[in-house]
Amino acid sequence: ALWNSLESGVLSAILATIIGATLALVIGLTDVRLKGPLVFLVLLPMMIPPHVTAISWIQALGPSSPLLRSLGIAPEIGSTHPLYSREGVILLLALQHAPLVFLVVRAALRAQPRELMDAARIAGASAGRVLTRIILPLLLPALLAGYALAFVSALGNFGIPALLGIPARYTTLPVLIWQRMASFGVGMLTNVSVIAMIMAVVAVVAVTILYVLQRYGRTALTGPPRPPLAISLG
């Protein structure tokens, strides 16, 4: 269970960081339309309990899904649901926690000095070069902070691993705590306390490591609030 928690936490946090940071860059730096509704849609998973998210995706990708049936790719009735797997747990954890990364990165983008980006564009740098040479290095502390939030949130998530992991025999520490509590066996409270302590130690160690990395990558470049870049998407 400890390995499964670490694996799902690390991998889902990486995926959540990629998704959340990409959405923050697209919404914060381009001229994409309807930014307000897009931000709401990105943040929507945070407003939905994890177990409800899992149930929704199970129905959306199941044999009775109207969309998949219309496309002719719905799983056969009686077959194993594709989300009942290690990959399904990691994917939904990433989707659930990507908004956390989005909020952190978007806030960091709004605090970056616009002058550096404007100077690079005036000097003839392409949008891709500005992104890789200026924006991403300045965002490194925010990316690490977003990753830490996603990892700790995934480590303590119960709803998604319970609904998707138990059928696949993929047990994480929160699920193991629930199973121990439901058993009402001798020494149940002791077992639960030990497991909870392990989770706390893992979370503290992970956050401490990322804090140290942040200190080495920290920048003090901030600027007054100004309109963000609006890189044309064509």
Regions found by a protein language model. Name each.
Residues 1-110, 138-159, 163-165, 192-212, ...:
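Membrane-water interface segments at the C-terminal ends of transmembrane alpha-helices
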Residues 33, 125-126:
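Short coil/turn motifs that cap or connect alpha-helices
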Residues 39, 69, 73, 114-122, ...:
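Short amphipathic alpha-helical coupling elements at transmembrane boundaries
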Residues 62-74, 166-176, 217-225:
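Peri-membrane helix termini and adjoining interfacial loops of integral membrane proteins
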Residues 123-125, 137:
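Glycine/proline-centered hinge or cleavage motifs at structural transition points of membrane proteins
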Residues 128, 210-234:
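Transmembrane alpha-helical segments of polytopic membrane transport and secretion proteins
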Residues 159-186:
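Glycine-rich helix-loop "coupling/hinge" segments at transmembrane-helix boundaries
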